[in-house]
Amino acid sequence: MTLFFSHRLFTVWRLKCGVMDIGWPSVLPAAGKKYQIELPVVHEEELEEQFVRGSGPGGQATNKTSNCVVLRHIPSGIVVKCHETRSVDLNRKRAREILREKLEVAYKGEESELLKMKKESMQKKQDKRRKVNENIEKKRRFKEMLNSKQEDDKST
């Protein structure tokens, strides 16, 4: 039996004692994704994939394993290199996600939802930083005012 509350589907299990137990939604959004944007579909025959040795810290473990994925989208010529994890499978998945995001920006340009979200995020960070700097400046002026009053009180 499935119930529908607001925007989620809940599965109901009937227990032997006759009590109904409502479980988690049967379909969950991807973990860690705060946005749902329709990204372009990438077909495997349009991709050229290579596995190369990664770079960066890690010493011998990094130097002798080829778990860095280089993915090239043949029609557009976009190249993505992913070496985020030690797992080739996870790097392959992540490289495809990055490629889809880059294709979204390349095809839609300024109309891209990802680009709009990135600009919005940067604007929020700048506003927050500006407010922090304003508060620091106010505190500095307040301390100067207190110090000058204390000096005036001492001199009189």
From Swiss-Prot:
Keywords attached to this entry: Coiled coil, Methylation, Mitochondrion, Protein biosynthesis, Transit peptide
SUPFAM superfamilies per UniProt: Release factor
Gene Ontology molecular functions: ribosomal large subunit binding; translation release factor activity; tRNA binding
Biased composition (Basic and acidic residues): 114-125, 132-156
Stretches assigned to coiled coil: 100-141
Compartment(s): Mitochondrion
Assigned GO CC terms: mitochondrion
Region span, GGQ domain: 44-108
Region of interest: Disordered: 114-156
Motif mapping: GGQ: 58-60
UniProt cross-references to InterPro entries, sorted A to Z: Mito_Transl_Release_Factor, Pep_chain_release_fac_I, Pep_chain_release_fac_I_sf
One GO BP annotation of this record: rescue of stalled ribosome
One Pfam family named in its UniProt record: RF-1
Main location: mitochondrion
Subunit and interaction comment: Interacts (via C-terminus) with MTRES1 (via S4 domain). Associates with mitoribosomal S39 large subunit, peptidyl tRNA and nascent chain.
Family: Belongs to the prokaryotic/mitochondrial release factor family.
Role: Part of a mitoribosome-associated quality control pathway that prevents aberrant translation by responding to interruptions during elongation. As heterodimer with MTRES1, ejects the unfinished nascent chain and peptidyl transfer RNA (tRNA), respectively, from stalled ribosomes. Recruitment of mitoribosome biogenesis factors to these quality control intermediates suggests additional roles for MTRES1 and MTRF during mitoribosome rescue.
Written domain comment of the UniProt record: The GGQ domain interactS with the peptidyltransferase center (PTC) of the large ribosomal subunit to trigger nascent chain hydrolysis.
PANTHER family: MITOCHONDRIAL TRANSLATION RELEASE FACTOR IN RESCUE, PROBABLE PEPTIDE CHAIN RELEASE FACTOR C12ORF65
Protein known as: Mitochondrial translation release factor in rescue
Organism expressing this protein natively: Danio rerio (Zebrafish)
Upper classification of the organism: Eukaryota, Metazoa, Chordata, Craniata, Vertebrata
Name of the encoding gene: mtrfr
